[in-house]
Amino acid sequence: MVFLRFASLGLLILSLSACGLLPEQEDETKDWSANQFYSRASAELADANYQQAIKYYEMLEARFPFGRYAMQAQLDVAYAYYKFDEPESAIAAADRFIKLNPTDPHVDYAYYLKGVVNFTRNIGFFDRFVPVDAAQRDPGAARQSFNDFAELVRRFPNSKYTPDAIQRMVFLRNNLAQSEVIAARYYMKRGALLAAANRAQYVVENYERTPAMKQALELLIEAYDGLGMEQLAQDTRRVLALNEEQGTFKDFETAKPRTLGRKVWDFIGLDRN
């Protein structure tokens, strides 16, 4: 028994000694320049190796916190996080870039990226294979995305990202309106007529000139009839008939406005000057 104990102790000592004899793994990046870090990170990003790209961008900023490479890495890592399906980290990185570089020529991209991240963040893994109507998803991220794009449009009306942001805002607004209609129908089926009327009224007041407007008015009429509010039901019927006569109920995308930009200015109430 004593022999076995000494033998075990000897083996332990030998193993520890062997560990000490093995050379430590050398850090290939120890002598890298900022340019080398950025080039490697960008190559990994281009090859869709997003986790590796994030690692090198963050190492670059840690070792070379000042200079143009570090500044660009702050922005690129936000995109890498977005592609790596880490929306919270992507938005945090974009916010950090905006805070540290408010006058940078590329800061408009940081605002745009925030909108894009929120635009897609509520599409989960399952939705990628079994698509779900966007209007049936939780509208929280859609509202935040709309606000992010609106901030971009307000601050940088001439940005190259603004036209795409405006198109996305139109899509988001239509789907936000439709989500309210879906909620109103849900309440209607459950017999909660007042709740249904409130949801439909919200669409009428906040989402004019969307495809959901006609449905909202029809739901309002049904709810008012059920509640015995005859005068309100009649008034809403007149509004519905008037809009149908004037051809108001056109899909926003197929209507012929003066300009797409002017449509969105009207919707979000921004300064048109």
Which stretches of residues belong to each language-model region?
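Sec-dependent bacterial lipoprotein signal peptides
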Residues: 1-19
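Acidic, polar-rich low-complexity tracts and alpha-helical solenoid repeat scaffolds
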Residues: 18-273
